[in-house]
Amino acid sequence: MTEPGRAESAAALAQCPRLAAGEPFDFVCAGCGDCCRNRRDLVLSGYDLYRIARRLGLPPRLTADAFCKQEFAPQTLLPAVVLRPNARTGNCPFFEADACTIHAARPLACALYPLGQAIDPATAAMEYYVQLPLCGTRVPAQEQRTLQNYLDDAAITARAGIDARWAVVCTQLSDKLQQAGGRENPRYLPAARRIARALYFDYSIQDDFYPQFNANTQALWPLLDKML
């Protein structure tokens, strides 16, 4: 059963109501922190990790080693960085004293809540779905808040281009690994580790993310051609 506010798959998300940018959306975060508790499914993008690392003043790899676990997604075959829950509480490692300690740099999934986002890997078009929230309040109807207002306030619009490009590149990399035989290819693990460097770790927090992401992925493709 899908937990409220946390669709378990793209198929589950597609069953939720879809919302256009100009449609009313009156959800307001109440600051209760319920969405931060027992959160074990939060996969980070490279941009998410970079933003957290920059907020902490640490290199991305050190940030991942301290707060995340690394795995290889069974369906996409791609490396994934997942927030590791606090061993004592089971909550997000950045949830302390009933507040997010990295709120300005919170991951996309947190900023979206209770929305789900789907990105078309061919066109980079984004769609948003309303999931059943665990909490929150509602703004008065006369304020006429829309989905676009919510996205703007949560700084999701400002990062949309990076998130779309991330989705497109990850789909292309997944296809590359699948076509090369996936885990049956003896060079899969070295290739996947090299992909992890390009997507997550080979970044300076003193420089902007997107130019580094483009440079990393452009250098990655010829390497994968040789490795696979």
Language-model regions, residue ranges each:
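Short loop/turn segments that flank or connect secondary-structure elements
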Residues: M1-L228
